[in-house]
A protein has these predicted regions:
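Serine-dependent carboxylesterase/thioesterase catalytic core
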Residues: 2-133, 144, 156, 167
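Extended, polar/charged low-complexity intrinsically disordered and coiled-coil segments in eukaryotic
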Residues: 54-62, 68, 100-282
Length: 282
């Protein structure tokens, strides 16, 4: 997962020596692939090296401090953005809306997840080989020589775009990295004429999270693993953008409409893409 993407990034960077910055925008499973790829591409930076680089490019104090976080493929990490990505996997109750909360269907999907190959095992947290924690648990910390959380931390902006409803593949909680009680209530939804399908925006905020690396080994049940992933990822501030196509004729395709996969079928998601562009850091 993510190795081919990392190799492609390296090949592009080698061909384009003028590049200085890098951002990732990913949809669905691609968000998890991107998280793995940036861990492979992450390079820690010493303060002296970063200071010299900043002096060379004449950037402000904030950028100097940010550069100390490290680089991705030798470039300055700017935006890490995902659309409808199952950051917490799909094993937990109601994480796959298609099953309408049916425990029987969820258990059946869990048992048959091997059909989807390695990705299916990863998403259902069944990849417990050689007594290692499932990959998605490994990815909420720096595991071995893969600096998953350090790579995410190195980006100036981390944003998750999530479907509130009508996405039958990826649930709202897993795509927005929230607990059930943390989901915004409908009375809090906004009505923005510029972005009619964006109903809530949560600004990034630092959280005081009680997390230790040992937790990824201790978690055994589905709820324990989900809580560990939430704690691990929420050590970093995230911008959360909640999207609803409830009134759209294209709502049945919400999982693809959120990123306008095909204009003919998913054009109603254009305002979501414009929102991403308007808030993109450069």
């Amino acid at each position: 997962m993510g190795r081919r993407l990392a190799e492609e990034v390296i090949s592009v960077v080698e061909c384009r020596p003028e590049l200085r910055k890098i951002s990732f925008v990913a949809h669905s499973l691609g968000g998890l692939i991107a998280r793995y790829a940036i861990a492979l591409l992450y390079e820690s930076a010493t303060q002296s090296d970063s200071h010299e680089e900043c002096e060379k490019h004449d950037v402000d104090y904030y950028s100097k401090q940010h550069t100390l976080e490290g680089k991705i493929a030798g470039l300055e990490p700017i935006n890490f953005i995902t659309f409808a990505t199952p950051h917490l996997g799909t094993r937990s109750h109601k994480q796959i809306p298609l099953f309408h909360g049916s425990n029987k269907l969820e258990k059946m999907a869990y048992r048959l997840s091997w059909i989807a190959g390695r990705s299916g095992k990863h998403l259902f947290l069944k990849d417990t080989e050689d007594e290692k924690p499932p990959l998605l648990l490994q990815m909420v910390t720096d595991y071995g020589d893969l600096h998953f959380i350090s790579a995410l931390r190195s980006f100036k902006r981390r944003a998750v775009y999530s479907n509130v409803c009508s996405d039958f593949i990826v649930g709202w909680m897993t795509s927005s990295i929230r607990r059930q009680h943390e989901l915004p209530k409908q009375q809090s939804f906004i009505n923005d004429g510029r972005y009619p399908h964006i109903v809530y925006v949560e600004k990034p905020k630092a959280q005081d999270v009680d997390f230790s690396d040992a937790m990824i080994y201790q978690a055994k049940t589905t709820s324990e693993m989900e809580e560990v992933m939430l704690k691990g990822l929420n050590r970093l501030p995230w911008e959360r953008v909640d999207v609803s196509f409830k009134k759209s004729r294209q709502r049945i395709f919400a999982h693809s409409t959120i990123q306008v996969k095909t204009y003919f079928l998913n054009s109603d998601g254009a305002d979501v893409i414009f929102h991403m562009i308007d808030h993109f850091l450069y």
